[in-house]
Amino acid sequence: MFHATTIVAVKKGDQVAMAGDGQVTMGQATVMKHKARKVRRLFHGKVLAGFAGSVADAFTLFEKFENKLEEYQGNLQRAAVELAKDWRMDKALRNLEALLIVADKQSMLLISGSGEVIEPDDGIAAIGSGGNYALAAARALVKNTDLQPAQLVQEAMEVASSICVYTNDQIIVEEL
């Protein structure tokens, strides 16, 4: 379900960075696009969001999440919980296949369609087919280097792209 995507985010203090690869795969064997933008700025540039899953579903969720951010004046946690409620309860939304990582300078959350809103304990989150590789790399880098979040996510994505066939090295990094 979550092939052709890796998203990783790191929060250190009031700095946060998120990175995603650019590969879009159709089916199991055909790369359709190399430079897709899977990480975006939302809510006047104050929130980062990245998705893994169906592109059409992700656009729907980005739009709904941004509406929730507007409704709750940029309160990331409240917007995330309300999106997760809608996602779980609404018949049309329930069928969407995607995961989101959202972050602002205060917090980072992983949002799933089954209603989970999870804040990572260590300020590091990753999703998608290369997510476990990126997560392991980011944790090792945070523990053993003094790199800033933007450098950390870049390096973690490079590790993931060297291992996961559904993740390419066309990496987009956003930071707050």
UniProtKB/Swiss-Prot annotation:
PROSITE patterns: PROTEASOME_BETA_2 (PS51476). It catalyses: ATP-dependent cleavage of peptide bonds with broad specificity. Allosterically activated by HslU binding. One of its GO terms (biological process) is proteolysis involved in protein catabolic process. Keywords: Allosteric enzyme, Cytoplasm, Hydrolase, Metal-binding, Protease, Sodium, Threonine protease. The keyword Protease applies. The active site is at 5. Its EC number is 3.4.25.2. SUPFAM superfamilies: N-terminal nucleophile aminohydrolases (Ntn hydrolases). It is an enzyme of class 3 (hydrolase). Coiled coil: none annotated. Signal peptide: none annotated. It is found in: Cytoplasm. Pfam families: Proteasome. Na(+) binds at residues 161, 164, 167. Disulfide bonds: none annotated. The keyword Oxidoreductase does not apply. One of its GO terms (cellular component) is HslUV protease complex. HAMAP family: HslV. A double ring-shaped homohexamer of HslV is capped on each side by a ring-shaped HslU homohexamer. The assembly of the HslU/HslV complex is dependent on binding of ATP. Protease subunit of a proteasome-like degradation complex believed to be a general protein degrading machinery. Belongs to the peptidase T1B family. HslV subfamily. This is ATP-dependent protease subunit HslV. It comes from Desulfitobacterium hafniense (strain DSM 10664 / DCB-2).
